[in-house]
Amino acid sequence: MSAEAVPQILVPLCPANPLQPGQDIIVYLRPESNGILTESVLFKVLSNPQWKEKLTLSYLANLPGEFILRHRIVEHHYAVRLDFAARGRSAFTPSMRSALERFFGIPFDKAQILGAFEALQLLRLSAEELFQLWVPVYDILEIEGQLVKRLHDNVFVINYDIPALLHKNHAGTDVAVMLFRTTLDYDGFRPLIERIRDNLIQANMLDPTKTERRVFHYSKGPFEQLLDGLGYLWKSATERASLADLQFAQFLHAKGCTDEQILRYLTHPIGVLETGERRLEQNLFSFTLFDSYEEAWRKTLNFSQDF
């Protein structure tokens, strides 16, 4: 009987230090990418003195596909989007219905809205075929962190990419995960991403018409840093990273937030922003995209999940 696959931890997790400035940015490679070659391109860029002095590699591990499946890491990571893909039409909030009507110019009641899994059956497509189904850019809408694609005859599919994401993560695909601690803000970090993207294109590992997220993911905001960290950072085969290990969580703790509050932000990110007389529905991940820790925390002060 073969032993269970466990993470290969090359650089153990360095716990967060609330007295040390900087933020966590987690990077992990897509399972369909060529991991070894992609890592080579990535570390070649990072070895440049321009970036090396501003980044600290605080974790590096390889997560076996079998381990990812066993712990349902992908399902937990995409839990909110997975819920919308499963429930389809019934998952839409009133604000989301209005946004769809405004963007596509069709009454919500007249639209045939399918969750991604229902669409696979009705349209008789594979997960990859649904994901790759081309439509013009004006037929794709992001609402509250959910992706809606309009097909023919006013058929709409919500989170059409989720089945393919789940399918690509299987026992034979390993994922390399890195944590970088950096004093760079997101404006300063973006040129690094562009340099990596350019090098991937030069190495024929990325289609110039596609975004870098086809090859790798990086945390795009403080709350996504927490989501990525709790899902993909493992101290051992049995112990995940905790909130105490992550810089933004330490920052929130210092502001008086409890673990329970923080975890609720991650599991129920859609809420209402109270701005005077206005009540604006927001997804906290989208709302704090590329924010500093201070900016993201301030936005939570008027954010309510009871609506």
Over which residues does each language-model region extend?
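Non-catalytic terminal and connector segments of soluble metabolic enzymes
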Residues: 1-307
